[in-house]
Swiss-Prot record:
The gene is Nnt. This is NAD(P) transhydrogenase, mitochondrial. The modification N6-succinyllysine is found at residues 117, 224, 294, 331, 1079. Disruption phenotype: Higher levels of adrenocortical cell apoptosis and impaired glucocorticoid production are observed. The modification N6-acetyllysine is found at residues 70, 397. Keywords: Acetylation, Membrane, Mitochondrion, Mitochondrion inner membrane, NAD, NADP, Transit peptide, Translocase, Transmembrane, Transmembrane helix. Its EC number is 7.1.1.1. NAD(+) binds at residues 182-184, 237, 257-259, 287, 300, 319. The transhydrogenation between NADH and NADP is coupled to respiration and ATP hydrolysis and functions as a proton pump across the membrane. May play a role in reactive oxygen species (ROS) detoxification in the adrenal gland. The chain crosses the membrane at residues 475-493, 501-521, 527-546, 558-578, 596-616, 622-642, 646-666, 672-691, 702-722, 740-760, 778-797, 801-819, 833-853, 857-879. In the N-terminal section; belongs to the AlaDH/PNT family. In the C-terminal section; belongs to the PNT beta subunit family. Residues 44-474, 579-595, 880-1086 are mitochondrial matrix. It is found in: Mitochondrion inner membrane.
Amino acid sequence: MAHLLKTVVAGCSCPFLSNLGSSKVLPGKRDFVRTLRTHQALWCKSPVKPGIPYKQLTVGVPKEIFQNEKRVALSPAGVQALVKQGFNVVVESGAGEASKFPDDLYRAAGAQIQGMKEVLASDLVVKVRAPMVNPTLGAHEADFLKPSGTLISFIYPAQNPDLLNKLSERKTTVLAMDQVPRVTIAQGYDALSSMANISGYKAVVLAANHFGRFFTGQITAAGKVPPAKILIVGGGVAGLASAGAAKSMGAVVRGFDTRAAALEQFKSLGAEPLEVDLKESGEGQGGYAKEMSKEFIEAEMKLFAQQCKEVDILISTALIPGKKAPVLFSKEMIESMKEGSVVVDLAAEAGGNFETTKPGELYVHKGITHIGYTDLPSRMATQASTLYSNNITKLLKAISPDKDNFHFEVKDDFDFGTMSHVIRGTVVMKDGKVIFPAPTPKNIPEEAPVKPKTVAELEAEKAGTVSMYTKTLTTASVYSAGLTGMLGLGIVAPNVAFSQMVTTFGLAGIIGYHTVWGVTPALHSPLMSVTNAISGLTAVGGLALMGGHFYPSTTSQSLAALATFISSVNIAGGFLVTQRMLDMFKRPTDPPEYNYLYLLPGGTFVGGYLAALYGGYNIEEIMYLGSGLCCVGALGGLSTQGTARLGNALGMIGVAGGLAATLGGLKPDPQLLAQMSGAMAMGGTIGLTIAKRIQISDLPQLVAAFHSLVGLAAVLTCMAEYIVEYPHFAMDATSNFTKIVAYLGTYIGGVTFSGSLVAYGKLQGILKSAPLLLPGRHALNAGLLAASVGGIIPFMADPSFTTGITCLGSVSGLSTLMGVTLTAAIGGADMPVVITVLNSYSGWALCAEGFLLNNNLLTIVGALIGSSGAILSYIMCVAMNRSLANVILGGYGTTSTAGGKPMEISGTHTEINLDNAVEMIREANSIVITPGYGLCAAKAQYPIADLVKMLTEQGKKVRFGIHPVAGRMPGQLNVLLAEAGVPYDIVLEMDEINSDFPDTDLVLVIGANDTVNSAAQEDPNSIIAGMPVLEVWKSKQVIVMKRSLGVGYAAVDNPIFYKPNTAMLLGDAKKTCDALQAKVRESYQK
């Protein structure tokens, strides 16, 4: 039994079962009470934890004795962190004085201040510099270390074998801070990077101190000061820190590195990357560059020799682990620099990258100041000590995560990037035994290049899996649902008038559908502008509900007056903006126009109606029909350049006839007519003023703002109609229908109003263009929709006025909020779809007014606008290979995205300067320019137009290729180019130009990224997979003009940047285009 009990409790961790296995059972009788007294001997203790309790360990922080070393291994904050962990900390008196950490701060942090010998005899000693001979005592610091103790310091074991032997005699365990593996998990302990960061920054500060001019360029009354030119060699931590500091001070920064990734980082900081013509990768181990071939070094020397003659300051950081620093700049190169220049050698401690460097010294050689200090981190001792202290405290906590005991295990078998990898790499000596270097870790990640299937191949496979039966069934189901819906409308129709109105709505929608499909994409912007103006017919609803005398006398009349006022803004402003855009498309060779003659049909239509009205004829319905047909003609006229001005004129005639018929049908008294005229005149004046002053580049935000007015007018009209009609609801059999339409119109108007305002804010730069992805936004939108739909129940069930107006107010608030949440979640790149959707919304709001007021004109015009906006939205979505729901709900990815890991882009890019670009342009005979939103933002259309004119005069074939979603609204780029005088007949759409790229000599990509991204066709896992793009990479040569190699709005890397036929011309679009145009002009004038 005793054996069984021992077996059961052998693994017990309860404190009650202590010493059961080792306790002797004494012979003889035992008293029961005695057994209870000795019950503790019957319970086992917890398993003993490995390691030593923190409270039994002392961490020592000695003063650094290396010459001019001002750093200290632990800051007071670091001491406090270790004391909190449980360590006892002792600091040598004065250890932190040079770092501005007096002894009192250490005492306050919980440390004890002791002498040098007591500190070095601690269990764990932390230092900056490796132990060395103390000249005062004439003894080595290692001799004072506690036997079998632990040392954490910079060691450099490969260069200091004698030191390792000395430490081995003391059986020391050594953690070398310079050997921390450069893996992701160890970034917080990487002291080399911390110190290099400080060295890079300090190098720029010292250079600025010894340089005789400003870093930044200045224009003063005394003259112009050019910016300093700085070359930084080495794109490691120090080099990038130098680049960032120099760039922030306004210098022109150039960076060189043999590694492509480092050059990319230079670019991200705004520095100009330099490369040699010879392509060779310099990627080495541990984050360092490897030694390059003889041919590469020769090309490198040639580049450096040229740069020495141009730059003012040289900063070099090139190191090779375990070896002397390479000499990159000869004495002749340095002497070729301008007098007063400065060179800073961050590799001085390893011999230096300059032949003229004197390690540890600052001196002047033939007018060139040389800074060869080897203690740059020490010259910022406070900051350096703080970062080094953070590295050590984080390392100690990471290698020994136990809360009570200090313990870590050194393994020779470990995986790459794990904590075992960090420990084994850092520990260079264990209990006196040298274990440096560490063995190679397992599972080093390797990228196996796998050529994925193209998007077209995957789409073909997907299409092959869908049977004809499924396709036919889907189509039949859609038509069945549509016809069933028509039958349902017939059943619920309250009267014949409703059925007639639905018929009008349906026919107008069909006409609008076929009319808008015929509009050329170049005229999509004028189309949206003219529909904006026509949607101002919400004024008809406002006029119908206005009342009072010179001023409105009731709430409903005030709402109606306000609706009329803001609708008039839309009418006048929309037509004037449309006319301005159409005037831009006129070519010098076009025949003269006599558009004033369109006053004849306008005057006949309106004047004839007034004559008929005076004669006692009531022909308002015919007027509405005529106005509706004119609006149809307006949309149809904008299908081609030749009839576009007629279309705008027909729109004006239609709106004028509709307003005249409305006033004639109402027959207001003179006082009310004055109120109506005043509201429309004021609104029209404001609209004309805005339209006259607006810049064409700001057209998208103007359209969005005008959409908001339509939505607000619809809300006001619906609420006013409810207030006016409420007294008649009890006697009107169709009152329920009126209430439903009023509720629906209020909801649509609210969404249109707020959504348009958010779109305006994003386009104008008032709000961030990035999508606002609220947590749980889909649930929030679903809740708002459910609340809006649910609100109709009390609205219809309770006949009281208070409930009705409250429900309308609530749905207007809910829909307004929903418009904000929906539109805020959509990024700037999707604004073309947002604007077209809002355009469609405004049309449906107008339809609701038409049903509400039983007005054929509003129904016809609303159906036209609604269908045109829907079709444009569909065109935009097809151009991005995305569904409308995906865009509206703030989604990402195309319908073809496979969802796997995106393809990694390999290779190097080629950069050219303006002279190279001019030469390529001169040699090309066929040129295509593909602009993007970058051209719009920079307003670079004018220099490009002038460039096109020059090239055309030289006999070159120059055309433009426009992507449907380039810009921030449909057709925006076409209008901007027309504004600059580019003939519209050389501006082609994507479908027209794509087949011509293989025969094109040169393509200029200006400010475009996603719309020319080949990943859409090459990478099935890309979030833009399957998106139709301009296939510019198929041309013979491509010049991409961008600010940087950064991604576009879709945040997708662009493979064309690294294709062999692509050259990058980086810089601001406007400045680059201006300079390019000037250079081309200069080249042809020679």
